[in-house]
Design a protein with these regions (language model features):
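N-terminal alpha-helical membrane-insertion module
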Residues: 1-95
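HKD (HxKxxxxD) catalytic microenvironment of the phospholipase D
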Residues: 199-240
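A broadly tuned preference for mixed-charge, low-complexity surface segments
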Residues: 29-34, 124, 157-171, 257-284
Length: 309
């Protein structure tokens, strides 16, 4: 039943309207049977008791038949509900809305992709806001590319350039390293700022064309290529269950990066702060000022890739 008192059946039928119409039809039939039919040509007077008995018999049979039909409808509708749609195609312009919807209805999130720009800038804040608002614990697993693997970084940047030629100049090895470092630094800080957040970070050594976002309600499969639709698999679908297992195995085969507590829980505001946190995390050791500045910029001004790249 919705806020207007409307109660919908399996096919969206207004139950109250249906029952009211059925009652009105029954009353009309009784009036016709008692007062109209006896006055038709050649009709004999019918006693009230005979009419009531006839009506009760008819209604009893109708009620039994209606009950059987209703049970069949409920049974088959229940089977339909137990077998959700296996996959839905999400238009490029609707991807952000679908991810936001999933983030606002989950207590866990598993990400597997490349730099996690969108996750860091948009999904993660939504997850934290929901956890704080409802007092729930939040479990987050994030798998990004290993920023210290130079060959991997070069392979990814070349792939990213080819996937989006209009932004070819944006992606460089340093840009990719900076975006990944910004994601890790953000997660490291938040994991100690929010007691209800359980966060684990994994470093992958291979590049996939797909980005996986797994929540309690669905799994979203997106691609780096601009203008490409996403695939959404709802919870209960075979692919959703398979993806959960795949993510678990993939994380086990990746390198988990510890998130040590900083003595000052730094929220980097300068190049020296970034250098200190990277040293604490033991990634990108010996990074020069250019890379540190790129990392600081990515951290302080996260970019929504669906809006600009």
């Amino acid at each position: 039943m919705d806020d207007t008192g409307r109660s919908d059946g399996p096919a969206g039928v207004n139950t109250k309207l249906y029952l009211s119409s059925l009652g009105l039809a029954a009353a009309l039939l009784i009036v016709i049977r008692l007062f109209a039919l006896p006055h038709l040509g050649g009709a004999t007077k019918v006693s009230l008791s005979d009419t009531i008995i006839s009506i009760v018999d008819s209604l009893t049979g109708a009620a039994v038949a209606a009950l059987c039909v209703s049970l069949l409808v409920v049974f088959f509708y229940g089977l339909k509900r137990q077998n959700p749609i296996e996959v839905q195609v999400t238009a490029p312009g609707s991807i952000a809305a679908e991810l936001a919807k999933a983030a606002d209805a989950t207590n866990s999130w598993d990400y597997r992709g490349h730099t996690a720009r969108y996750f860091r800038s948009t999904v993660l804040p939504t997850l934290l806001q929901r956890a704080e608002r409802q007092g729930h614990y939040l479990s987050v697993n994030v798998q990004v590319l290993d920023p210290d693997n130079v060959e991997l970084m070069d392979f990814f940047t070349e792939y990213r350039r080819n996937a989006n030629p209009d932004r070819r100049d944006y992606w460089t090895r340093r840009r990719a390293q900076a975006e990944i470092a910004a994601t890790i630094i953000r997660l490291q800080l938040l994991s100690y700022q929010f007691s209800r957040l359980n966060c684990r970070v994994y470093l992958a050594s291979t590049v996939s064309p797909f980005t996986i976002d797994l929540s309690d309600t669905c799994v979203m499969v997106t691609r780096e290529k601009a203008g490409t639709a996403a695939l959404k698999y709802p919870v209960g679908s075979s692919f959703y269950d398979s993806t959960k297992e795949d993510m678990r195995l993939s994380n086990r085969q990746s390198t988990e990066l510890p998130l040590p507590r900083s003595a000052t829980e730094l929220d980097p505001g300068s190049v020296s702060d970034v250098r200190e946190v990277l040293s604490l995390l033991d990634i990108l050791q010996g990074a020069d000022d250019e890379l540190l500045n790129l990392t600081l910029d990515a951290y302080r001004r996260p970019v929504n890739p669906y809006a600009s790249a």
